[in-house]
Amino acid sequence: MPVEPLSQKEIEDRLAELPGWSLDGDRISRSYRLGSHFAAAAMVVHIAQVQEELDHHSDLTLSYHTVSLTVNTHSVGGAVTELDFALARRVEDLAPGHGAS
């Protein structure tokens, strides 16, 4: 099944279901605060595992107690697609287990 870019309305509707996520130009993004650098690093590893499973990868940034990610779909020219929201939902599901807020 081909991946298609989402419309602005579709993006806004999906973002409404993912508090903390926002549209940043041509990508969706979110930052998480964690209790320690080690916890943040562990979350990055967990996100990387999910990305490999989905075969869909974000830009991840690890800071002192913060993990930030931005995601869009390169295969459709860098637009936001359902794949990006699938990854965002998976990250939202794993974040509480790392103590992320």
Swiss-Prot record:
Its EC number is 4.2.1.96. Pfam families: Pterin_4a. GO terms for biological process: tetrahydrobiopterin biosynthetic process. It catalyses: (4aS,6R)-4a-hydroxy-L-erythro-5,6,7,8-tetrahydrobiopterin = (6R)-L-erythro-6,7-dihydrobiopterin + H2O. Keywords: Lyase. NCBIfam families: PRK00823.1-2. This is Putative pterin-4-alpha-carbinolamine dehydratase. It comes from Streptomyces avermitilis (strain ATCC 31267 / DSM 46492 / JCM 5070 / NBRC 14893 / NCIMB 12804 / NRRL 8165 / MA-4680). The lineage of its organism: Bacteria, Bacillati, Actinomycetota, Actinomycetes, Kitasatosporales. The gene is dcoH.
